[in-house]
């Protein structure tokens, strides 16, 4: 365990909203506190509305903390870097604690990010990503401070255009507010804080990293967290206290950060050393891709390093004048801060690269054969990462400003005239504390457990301070992904805080015409109306599956703005036409490379898939309005939806084929259009049956891939065909066979010329939705009324003869234990709310508690 990890371990093994972090003897304990949620701007920065408004923001004198003239401005998506030099600062306050002072309570934030300790004990890192108008701060209670001298210390950095694309910023700053007993000693702007600049930290190429995840780093000296400035000076106030007390008749807002208390728990801080080193070589160049041989899997350094990882030895030594490359299989996908403790060694350097998979040395592909993700012989490890150069006299403890991710690590080590002692190495796993609280099992299909395992891991790896499409690329929220992810979270856990946060962030980012950002938060904005439609579906999902009416009511202006904005793009017939931006639908083999359905681009006219999503958005809006008591608004969307449905049938329905075409020319047909039409109830029942029959039998339809299979599976279960769902899971079964520990972005495929194409990403949580369907489809547990006050259990088990499931509910869990035989069900349903059980002609009322099914 590194010196840096040791500080964290003293503080916590897993950070949660309810547990005090255990401390070592004579060290303080830290407890997260949640300030009352505020969902509107209100008087923020006009009046003092919270304790932190009495604190000032600090920075280093002489540094503007802002983008300089001639630099690439925030908002550019180019990858050519900028002129801004990242700055890393350390703020310090030495203070005295007296008898009777009691617990210390602090509110803390920074721009861009901070790492905070008290007497060397880890307190927190943050803040959670957001917009300047919704800047986040956290609150902590620090207990056990004995009389005497203590130190609060924060490492704060502003990377600017070399930070991940999702990192927004106003200017550099640090703010901390202490409770009354400690106010004069600790509150920034009241107490004296020292600040110093840390040296030896510089970006090292590819400043957007792996497609938007930030710079790689070259760090020389002692490391970001433990390094000391060469000189200290008094920190200066760069923005004074926000707002004023009492009435403010002019309503003027203080510029800059508008602070809101974070409502999501801290990220996990688990120190781990997973997996094992599987190959070692002295033949690779510095940070060079090297194809490993079988002999290199048996090199003596393999066993020696694995003994070191297992704690059997206290150090791993690389001799003087040596080049060594190690291939480390982490065993499963992980998001973590790398941590390594290096001894003093003049001329030594240590590189730590991360990648999702090994690549074959012959064709550079990851491969789809069984066990491909675990293979190393004949393969190389690429990826991206960081270089650490220890102080020649003192060594150093190294980590990175932001987490790294993947299933594989490649360590490149080079020494000069002195040996390098690696004193410790570990990972601090970082993610939202989302755990699998639900359950599903059937002895009839063992593969379902494996599919749940990789789906859950994918969801965990894409859930952090905000949701990600994927952790290796972009690290941004995309509404199409997010809508699916939110329902996966609903199926995994009763915790709805990330669900609310995601919808909130999109609401904060909508444009003046109601369009939701295609990717958000971001400095490199994209537009796409089809994803605005996906954003609108999240409201109805929340209204049905969760219970916070007050929160949903506060978000209603966002729903209404975007719904009204979509109406601006209707033509004279009421159809959406010439939508702005990228009308992405799915990565479909046979469509153009950009994933847009035929007729979906600007200037191409009208398209069925986009208009059918608009139908679903109207259903979602009507449901949400009605759930909140706005019947007039709900009827407006119901009536408008009926008119749109009729026009869609008139324009796109091909009676000869019993299918919806993608365009009025009726030459292109997709599973996507049929699914959306059937889910939107645009056809009468008899024609819907015809459409469904052709959906499952016509082999020339363009097929849904990983993401859009969500809508396909919803359609299967709407028509009671759990057997089709189980069959279509073969793609996920192949993931397991390949050795994947998460779900991919898209299927691998071969083009008409025999060229092989692979999924870009090995971890995309839009493919985690089988978890949702096992519980809501196979087990059939669904909300039957807004805010989940009623349940409908209507299992569609396919060929399963028995199943057991546990599904989250705002008041607990709904559990089923069922057997199926000759079209009859038997077993048990336990529920915290009343409802109905439906199967094979049976319709049984469910009461609160345990219900026998016979």
Where are these regions (language model features)?
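Bacterial N-terminal signal peptides
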Residues: 5-17
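Active-site acid/base region of carbohydrate-active enzymes
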Residues: 182-195, 408, 416-454, 460, ...
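Helix-terminus loop motifs that line ligand-binding clefts
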Residues: 125-130, 357-380, 493-596, 730-754
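Non-catalytic C-terminal accessory modules of carbohydrate-active enzymes
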Residues: 210-211, 216-221, 639, 726-854
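Catalytic-core region of carbohydrate-active enzymes that cleave or remodel glycosidic bonds
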Residues: 708-738
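Alpha-helical support elements that line or immediately flank enzyme active sites
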Residues: 140, 337-356, 409-414, 475, ...
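Solvent-exposed loop and edge beta-strand segments that line ligand/cofactor-binding
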Residues: 80, 327-330, 398-399, 467-479, ...
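Extracellular/oxidizing-compartment recognition motifs
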Residues: 21-469, 481, 497-498, 516-521, ...
């Amino acid at each position: 365990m590194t010196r840096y990890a040791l500080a964290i371990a003293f503080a916590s093994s897993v950070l949660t909203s309810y547990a005090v972090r255990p401390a070592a003897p004579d060290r303080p304990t830290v407890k997260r506190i949640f300030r009352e949620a505020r969902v509107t701007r209100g008087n923020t920065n006009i009046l003092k509305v919270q304790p932190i408004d009495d604190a000032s923001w600090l920075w280093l004198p002489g540094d503007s903390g802002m983008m300089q003239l001639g630099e690439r401005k925030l908002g550019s998506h180019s990858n050519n870097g900028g002129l801004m030099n990242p700055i890393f600062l350390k703020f310090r306050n030495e203070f005295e604690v007296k008898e009777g002072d009691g617990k210390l309570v602090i509110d803390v934030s920074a721009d861009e990010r901070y790492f905070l300790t008290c007497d060397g004990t880890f307190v927190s890192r943050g803040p959670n990503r957001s917009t300047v108008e919704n800047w986040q701060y956290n609150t902590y209670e620090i207990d056990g401070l004995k009389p005497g001298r203590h130190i609060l210390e924060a490492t704060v950095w502003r990377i600017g255009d070399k930070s991940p694309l999702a990192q927004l910023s106003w200017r550099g700053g640090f703010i901390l507010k202490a409770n009354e007993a400690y106010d004069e000693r600790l509150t920034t702007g009241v107490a004296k804080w020292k600040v110093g600049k840390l040296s030896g930290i510089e970006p090292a190429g590819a400043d957007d990293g792996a497609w938007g995840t930030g710079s790689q780093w070259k760090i020389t000296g002692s490391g970001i967290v433990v390094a000391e400035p060469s000189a200290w000076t008094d920190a200066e106030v760069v923005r004074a206290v926000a707002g004023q007390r009492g009435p403010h008749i002019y309503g003027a807002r203080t510029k800059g950060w508008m602070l809101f208390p974070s409502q999501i728990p801290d990220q996990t801080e688990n120190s781990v050393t997973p997996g094992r080193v599987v190959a070692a070589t002295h033949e690779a160049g510095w940070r060079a891709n090297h194809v490993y041989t079988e002999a290199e899997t048996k090199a003596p350094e393999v066993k020696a390093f694995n003994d070191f990882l297992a704690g059997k030895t206290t150090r791993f030594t690389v001799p003087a004048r040596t080049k060594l490359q190690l291939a480390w299989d982490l065993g499963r996908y992980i998001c973590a801060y790398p941590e390594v403790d290096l001894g003093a060694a003049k001329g030594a350097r240590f590189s730590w690269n991360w990648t999702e998979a090994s690549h074959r040395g012959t064709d550079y592909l990851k491969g789809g054969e069984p066990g491909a993700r675990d293979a190393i012989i004949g393969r190389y490890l690429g990826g991206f990462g960081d270089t650490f150069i220890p102080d020649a006299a003192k060594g150093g403890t190294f980590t990175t400003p932001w987490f790294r991710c993947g299933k594989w690590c490649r360590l490149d080590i080079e020494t000069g005239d002195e040996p390098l002692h690696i004193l410790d190495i570990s990972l601090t796993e970082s993610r939202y504390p989302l755990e699998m609280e639900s359950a599903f099992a059937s002895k009839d299909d063992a593969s379902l457990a494996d599919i749940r395992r990789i789906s859950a891991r994918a969801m965990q790896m894409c859930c952090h301070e905000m949701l990600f499409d994927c952790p290796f690329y972009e690290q941004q929220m995309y509404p199409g992904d997010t809508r699916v992810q939110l329902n996966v979270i609903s199926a995994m856990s009763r915790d709805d805080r990330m669900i609310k946060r995601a919808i909130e962030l999109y609401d904060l980012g909508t444009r003046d015409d109601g369009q939701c950002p295609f990717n958000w938060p971001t400095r490199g904005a994209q537009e796409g109306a089809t994803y605005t439609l996906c954003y609108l579906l999240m409201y109805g999902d929340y209204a049905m599956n969760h219970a916070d009416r007050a929160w949903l009511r506060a978000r209603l202006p966002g729903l209404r703005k975007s719904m009204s904005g979509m109406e601006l793009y209707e033509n004279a017939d009421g159809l959406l036409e010439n939508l702005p931006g990228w009308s992405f639908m799915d990565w479909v083999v046979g469509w153009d490379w950009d994933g847009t359905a035929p007729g979906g681009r600007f200037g191409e006219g009208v398209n069925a898939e986009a208009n059918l999503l608009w139908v679903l958005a109207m259903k979602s809006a009507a449901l949400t309005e009605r759930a909140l008591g706005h019947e007039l608004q709900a009827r407006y969307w119901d009536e408008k939806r009926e008119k749109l449905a009729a026009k869609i049938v008139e324009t796109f329905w091909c009676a000869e084929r019993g299918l919806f075409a993608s365009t009025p020319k009726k030459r292109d047909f997709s599973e996507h259009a049929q699914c959306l039409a059937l889910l939107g109830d645009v056809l009468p029942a008899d024609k819907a049956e015809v459409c469904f029959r052709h959906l499952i039998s016509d082999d020339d339809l363009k097929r849904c891939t990983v993401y859009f299979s969500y809508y396909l599976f919803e359609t299967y279960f709407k028509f009671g065909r759990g057997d089709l769902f189980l069959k279509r899971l073969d793609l996920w079964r192949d993931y397991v066979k390949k050795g994947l520990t998460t779900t991919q972005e898209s299927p691998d495929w071969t083009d008409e010329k025999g060229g092989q194409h692979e999924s870009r990403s090995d971890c995309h949580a839009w493919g985690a939705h089988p978890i949702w369907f096992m519980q809501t489809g196979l087990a059939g547990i669904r909300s039957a009324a807004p805010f989940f006050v009623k349940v409908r259990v209507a299992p569609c088990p396919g060929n399963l003869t028995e199943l057991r499931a546990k599904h989250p509910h705002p008041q607990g869990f709904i559990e089923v234990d069922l057997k199926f035989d000759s079209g009859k069900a038997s077993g048990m349903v336990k529920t915290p709310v009343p409802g109905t059980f439906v199967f094979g002609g049976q319709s049984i009322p469910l009461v609160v508690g345990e219900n026998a099914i016979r």
